[in-house]
């Protein structure tokens, strides 16, 4: 009986270790974030690191009744990519990807509208540093200001 209990305990420990490794694999990338949400402001220049779990928590906390709410993520390592979100409703998101040339914004962005589940799945891929752009249907937009 004791050996069966030990085997079961080891299986549970192995399963937990495997899950922790999965979280670790996407958790510690060189990604920073910036946001504005009512009384909480984090400036892009501060280069505050973030992991996927914290990112989803911050996104869930965005108050869509605040017209200035937004959150953005910059991958400072491998991809150099950036993605930004504005929460427009409980399950409604505006997403944008600035188009850069030689590290400078061209005044063009890719924009899309989606739901929480799709945006979260896309963000997971962003943090895993695998192709994520195809998760949403994008349109190009030019900013004139």
What are these regions, as identified by a protein language model?
Residues 3-52, 62-68, 76-82, 86-145:
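Acidic, proline/glycine-rich low-complexity IDRs
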